[in-house]
Regions:
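Juxtamembrane intracellular "pre-TM" segments in multi-pass secondary transporters
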Residues: 1-10, 189-222
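Substrate-agnostic recognition of the 12-TM MFS/MFS-like secondary transporter fold
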Residues: 11-29, 49-67, 71-86, 103-162, ...
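Transmembrane alpha-helix termini and helix-breaking/packing motifs in multi-pass membrane transporters
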Residues: 32-38, 91-96, 152-172, 245-246, ...
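C-terminal transmembrane bundle of multi-pass solute transporters/carriers
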Residues: 75, 206, 213, 224-227, ...
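C-terminal ends and interior cores of transmembrane alpha-helices
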Residues: 81-98, 291-304
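Small-residue hotspots at the loop-to-helix junctions and early N-terminal turns
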Residues: 27-30, 34, 39-46, 140, ...
Length: 425
């Protein structure tokens, strides 16, 4: 059997799930636009993201244990269906003119919980249906999906929302769900686990934590990425405050600069699918992040030109798929398939809990520390030369802080990760 036939199930699953992911993303973006129109509050829209991430932080460990207990395909189908029911509920409430803000928070929390269970099931499914020698390739394709979604999502969502309204956006989302559901239910064969799981959910969760405790390389990489996510999410919170107030910026320019990250990740994803396997995947993870952290933040901190903002985004994001692919291969090969659900779920808790913290800290630092500091020292010629003046200069200062913090994090953790080595040979 040639490699293409071996990957048939993966290609079907990947393509249809990617469309469904795009559909979910455009709905989330459109709901953000709708909510901001209703409230005019950045905090209200940020709360949507917090409601989605809260289940990740709280329930991931137990969700992974459930994944290992039950059939992976059925788990994905049930979770996707319940998430679609949430979306359908929003559609009905919107059409009957009874949609309220708290409805969105509640629906996002339930959808986030479903994603918390579905994500580790999906990760294990990929491991089961893909040959080991193709792990790097599928990691590159998954990165490509995330990149394309990040580019297309705001363009499609804003266009559909402006032309046809929220109802049409949700309809498109439900259609992509139906396509993905039919493909998974009818055409994808997911092999069963080789080991029957009899332990309780709590015991399985403890087993996932125990594996991380006994595998310091994997756990250290996860904690390293938690720090990266903290810096990156603080950056995400600071970027609008840097670009929108700038005379050469504005909301349209923010969209262009943000899309540059997606373009860079598309290029990086294509590189991953074509590049040879590195001699040491652990080194590839922390070196790529050091390059990203030590370039993008500093370029944006000291530049006032849109072209430099775009260049900074591209340099900062082009190596992210390389990091993701190498980390993904390490995890898939280091964790036994029968443990992957619970271990991936533990990974989600430890690696991603810093994202809402970073979003909060980034916004808090810009609004309450950096901008007031720059306003009080507006007379300083040195600070003005470095960060500009007026609103937005504090966000530029925050970029410098994040660049220093991110570089130090990579250097310090790099010294710890240097003792670990991983290659496919």
């Amino acid at each position: 059997m040639n490699n293409r036939n071996k990957l048939r199930d993966f290609y079907i699953l990947w393509s249809t799930q990617s469309l469904s992911q795009l559909g979910s993303s455009i709905t989330a973006f459109a709901l953000t636009l709708w909510l901001y129109e209703k409230t005019g509050s950045a905090l209200s829209t940020a709360a949507l993201t917090i409601c989605s991430y809260a289940p990740y932080v709280i329930m991931s460990i137990f969700a992974g244990a459930l994944t290992d207990r039950f059939d992976k395909k059925k788990t994905m189908l049930v979770c996707d269906t319940l998430a679609a029911v949430c979306t359908l509920t929003v559609f009905i409430l919107y059409k009957t003119d009874t949609l309220m803000i708290w409805h969105l928070y509640a629906v996002n929390a339930v959808s986030g919980l479903m994603n918390t269970v579905q994500q580790p099931a999906s990760e294990v499914t990929m491991t089961l249906i893909v040959p080991k020698e193709s792990y790097q390739k599928i990691s590159g394709l998954n990165s490509l999906t995330r990149s394309l979604v990040s580019i297309l999502n705001p363009l499609i969502a804003s266009a559909l929302y402006a032309l046809f309204g929220l109802g049409t956006v949700i309809t498109v989302d439900l259609l992509t769900f139906a396509l993905a559901f039919i493909a998974l239910a009818a055409f994808i064969n997911v092999p069963g686990s080789s080991k029957e799981v009899k332990e309780s959910t709590l015991e399985l969760a403890k087993e996932g934590l125990g594996f991380l405790r006994k595998t310091p390389m994997v756990f250290t990489l996860i904690i390293f990425m938690a720090g990266i996510n903290l810096i990156a999410s603080a950056y995400d919170a600071s970027l609008p405050a840097l670009i929108i107030p700038n005379p050469k910026g504005g909301s349209n320019m923010l969209g262009i600069v943000s899309s540059c990250a997606g373009v860079a990740m598309v290029i990086g994803s294509l590189l991953v699918t074509a590049m040879p396997k590195p001699k040491d995947r652990v080194k590839a993870v922390y070196v790529t992040m050091l390059i990203s952290m030590s370039t993008e933040n500093f370029i944006l901190a000291f530049s006032r030109a849109p072209v430099l903002w775009c260049i900074g985004q591209i340099i900062g994001w082009i190596l992210v798929p390389v990091m993701s692919a190498n980390l993904d291969v390490i995890l898939r090969n280091s964790i036994p398939v029968d443990l992957q659900g619970r271990v991936y779920a533990c990974r989600n808790t430890f690696q991603f809990f810093t994202i809402p913290i970073g979003l909060f800290l980034g916004g808090f630092m810009v609004d309450n520390v950096c901008e007031p500091f720059m306003a009080e020292h507006a007379y300083s010629a040195v600070l003005t030369m470095l960060f500009g003046s007026g609103k937005g200069s504090g966000a530029a200062l925050m970029m410098l802080i994040l660049g220093i913090a991110g570089s130090l994090h990579c250097i310090l953790f790099g010294s710890r990760l240097r003792k670990y080595h991983y290659s496919d040979s």
